[in-house]
Amino acid sequence: MLSVKQELLAALAGELEKLSPGSAGRAAFESPKVAAHGDFACTAAMQLAKPLKLNPRALGEQLKAALEATPAFARWVDAIEIAGPGFLNIRLKAAAKQEIVREVLSAGDRFGYQKDNGQRVLVEFVSANPTGPLHVGHGRQAALGDAICNLFSTQGWSVHREFYYNDAGVQIDTLTKSTQLRARGFKPGDECWPTDPENPASKTFYNGDYIQDIANDFLAKKTVKADDREFTANGDVEDYDNIRQFAVAYLRNEQDKDLQAFNLHFDQYYLESSLYTSGRVEATVNRLVEKGHTYEQDGALWLKSTDYGDDKDRVMRKKDGTYTYFVPDVAYHIAKWERGFAKVVNIQGTDHHGTIARVRAGLQAADVGIPQGYPDYVLHTMVRVVKGGKEVKIGKRAGSYVTLRDLIEWTSKDAVRFFLLSRKPDTEYTFDVDLAVAQNNDNPVYYVQYAHARIQSVLRAWAEAGGGDVASLKDVDLSALEGPQAQALMLQLAKYPEMLTAAAEGEAPHDVTFYLRDLAASYHSYYDAERILVDDEAVKRARLALVAATAQVLHNGLKVLGVDAPARM
């Protein structure tokens, strides 16, 4: 049906060009909001009526007659109706819709994929400080980043997944000091445990039980191995640097386990500390100074960021000689650009919104050829977790927050991914643990996965009865697929490639979750309306081809989300 649609669009473009030279680009179809209005809607007559000084409905009648005379419309279209002020409602023949079944079965796992576009994109996400286990907010970011990467892959991009490791900030000192105190036998609540002098009730060190675990392993002189490092503790509570390196390696290992539980893999871990040791931060600051985009005031070095759209100038280097946190960010993004990534997408929490203008200002001021608006940002809100009708704020591992691994252990990797992707990133989301484990239609991931498993059960029953395999269904006669539920299901299948393209362009994986729920609903309606394993062999094989194509698209869509498509449930 995708090829059918292209044929019809080409015919429409040709007729529009005849009516008004230069108007071929207006050739487009919309999906009617009401199924009774047809399969495609065209508004070209209303768009051209004013410049052509014609009545839109009369122009619609003229266009209708011209389209009906084309070979493509004669072959694939059952009827064209004029509605309202000039809408063209197009109703396809059953044979046109049946083509989508062949297209899906022929393309298989590649259905919905576009050709290689020869371009590279870097997506940076999670990028957590190595100071504790990944929390649920990191989980939302992980699900978003991975799904957006998968969407880009479907559109022909070469995708690079990157984790920026913040191993050079003040949080690392806090982690080290917290571990050192635990190693010395102290714990939160003791008089010596540091507090914020401006807010004595607030403990400024990390209090989770995982800090005691780090201290215990440090004293035991254990070796920890993470994705990018291995380190052995010496057990000396006075050796601050050794504690620091061990604690960072330990938590790198813990975060690796979190990511593995989420089935998430990165192409590169980029260390913030490397920006300092390589001289990139200093070189970036020097370039901004040389370009005349800085000034000194009150002992600090400032960037003239208001020259580039920021609401105020920003301090780059403080009085004590240390850099503010956006400076290494600017250096890091220059490095991304120099590595050949003309498109970069950063997935971050909405609390980072304030850094966008200053980072982009720094990149423009550096004058290295980076375009305005670089990089792209996808911002997400945090996640509220509810269990048993009550909000859960404390998990077993971190002590002060629910971790990603807590959520996976309470539910499943698939439920966490699907649920965290089921809303727009910038909308508040409440994760209902009880709903995520429910085996009913209210649970969206269960509903979609059950549709796939239900189809696989039918295909197994057919194969076990000596029917054959899915490959044998590619060229069957599909003329029996004429019922309303079958046609609705085929139309839903045909929407998948365009949905993927729109979701990739909008960096909106929630669109995939909406689509899959609609597809599952269409399948369940079809299954309830028509028996599949009937006695009539031709009808049976046609229906099997349709459900096999449906299973394929469910599988493909779930894969984009990083969710399994089970054969049994």
UniProtKB/Swiss-Prot annotation:
Task: State where it is primarily located.
Answer: cytoplasm
In chain numbering, motif 'HIGH' region lies across 128-138
InterPro entries in the record = aa-tRNA-synth_I_CS, Arg-tRNA-ligase, Arg-tRNA-synth_N, Arg-tRNA-synth_N_sf, ArgRS_core, DALR_anticod-bd, Rossmann-like_a/b/a_fold, tRNAsynth_Ia_anticodon-bd
Where it sits in the cell: the answer is: Cytoplasm
Task: Please report which protein family the annotation says this sequence is part of.
Answer: Belongs to the class-I aminoacyl-tRNA synthetase family.
PANTHER family in the record: ARGININE--TRNA LIGASE, CYTOPLASMIC, ARGINYL-TRNA SYNTHETASE
- Protein's recorded name: Arginine--tRNA ligase
Could you tell me which species this protein originates from?
Paracidovorax citrulli (strain AAC00-1) (Acidovorax citrulli)
Q: What is the lineage of its organism?
A: Bacteria, Pseudomonadati, Pseudomonadota, Betaproteobacteria, Burkholderiales
